[in-house]
């Protein structure tokens, strides 16, 4: 249940090329984040925690889309490989909390040029939820805009 009146911003997509010609992905490593939230109900304190590793979320979504994740860059498939970079790119106050914005880039392993990128924000019960939602919205926006 959300008491926020302001909607999340729609994902922003930049497309300089098509990712359909690529078969492999190499995802830059990211660190796990663990966050928690708590509340008092009827005089009792309840808490929950959530953990997320952004590269695992990205990998799961892209693998489901048919990409093959490589554990390292391989020279013999350079022309078919995208390097995937992730970063947190902002925060915005929204209602009683804030959103976390993420940006994901898809770089050609062969030319080191930006093929496409997406930026989206998420807001959940914890920062881990925010990040997971932002990544999902970002990639959903990218794949729903495929030509």
Predicted segments, located by residue:
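Short, solvent-exposed cationic patches
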Residues: 133-147
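A structural "domain/chain start" motif
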Residues: 1-65, 147
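Secreted/luminal cysteine- and crosslink-motif detector
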Residues: 6, 117-119, 139
């Amino acid at each position: 249940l959300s008491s926020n009146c302001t909607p999340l911003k729609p994902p922003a997509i930049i497309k300089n090329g098509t990712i359909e010609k690529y078969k492999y992905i190499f995802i830059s490593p990211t660190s796990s984040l663990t966050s928690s939230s708590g509340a008092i109900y009827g005089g009792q304190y309840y808490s929950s925690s959530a953990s997320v590793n952004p590269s695992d979320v990205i990998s799961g979504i892209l693998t489901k889309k048919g990409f093959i994740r490589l554990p390292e860059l391989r020279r013999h498939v350079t022309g078919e490989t995208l390097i995937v970079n992730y970063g947190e790119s902002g925060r915005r106050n929204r209602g009683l909390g804030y959103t976390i914005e993420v940006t994901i880039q898809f770089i050609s392993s062969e030319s080191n040029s930006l093929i496409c990128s997406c930026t989206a924000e998420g807001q959940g019960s914890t920062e881990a939820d925010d990040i997971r939602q932002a990544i999902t919205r970002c990639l959903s926006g990218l794949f729903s805009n495929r030509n």
